[in-house]
Amino acid sequence: MALRPAKIDRYVDKPAYTRREYIRGAPGPKITIFDMGNPAGDFEFEVALHTAEPVQIRQNALEAARQQVNRYLQKNVGRSNYHFKIRVYPFQVLRENPMATGRKADRYGNGMRRPFGKPIGLAARLKRDQKILSIRVNRQHLKFAIEGARRAAMKFPCKCYYRIYDKEGNDVTTKILSQGL
């Protein structure tokens, strides 16, 4: 079965559906690596990507963003000069009621009888202003981290914004951007 458009699953309008012990056939997570680069490194700044609205992000989008940002940072910054971390986990099990279409579909389709649906994928459920990912770098690589966050935001079905934090966790976005990169 083909992958449905992400706009179908992005809204947080249903109750959470996460208890795998009760779900038969729940798929495993496609995203397995959450820390990339140099996790033990000491970096000056952290560029964090936040959501602007409550949303569900499918695991396919998270994995696509992870691959894109990691490849971009490895190429431009070097493996030991950044720490990239995905901060959300896809717990929410998405389900679909497959509807029969085509000729004589009424003979073998169930329609809305027992319409609960079968598990088709996983998604991460995010609140407004929650961090999706963070990239820790030093000052000379800050523009590459901002560009990586921008590229990751294109993969997600919601409006996103980035913030720059210093070592202590203070928001220094306006200060850094006013000084120029």
UniProtKB/Swiss-Prot annotation:
Keyword annotations: Ribonucleoprotein, Ribosomal protein
Membrane-crossing residue ranges in chain numbering: none
InterPro entries per UniProt: Ribosomal_uL16, Ribosomal_uL16_arc, Ribosomal_uL16_CS_euk_arc, Ribosomal_uL16_dom, Ribosomal_uL16_euk_arch, Ribosomal_uL16_sf
One GO MF term attached to the UniProt entry: structural constituent of ribosome
Keyword Aminoacyl-tRNA synthetase on entry: no
Biological process annotations from GO: translation
Cellular component aspect of the GO annotation: ribonucleoprotein complex; ribosome
NCBIfam families documented for this protein: PRK04199.1-2 (NF003237), PRK04199.1-4 (NF003239)
Family note: Belongs to the universal ribosomal protein uL16 family.
Designated name of the protein: Large ribosomal subunit protein uL16
Record lineage: Archaea, Methanobacteriati, Methanobacteriota, Thermococci, Thermococcales
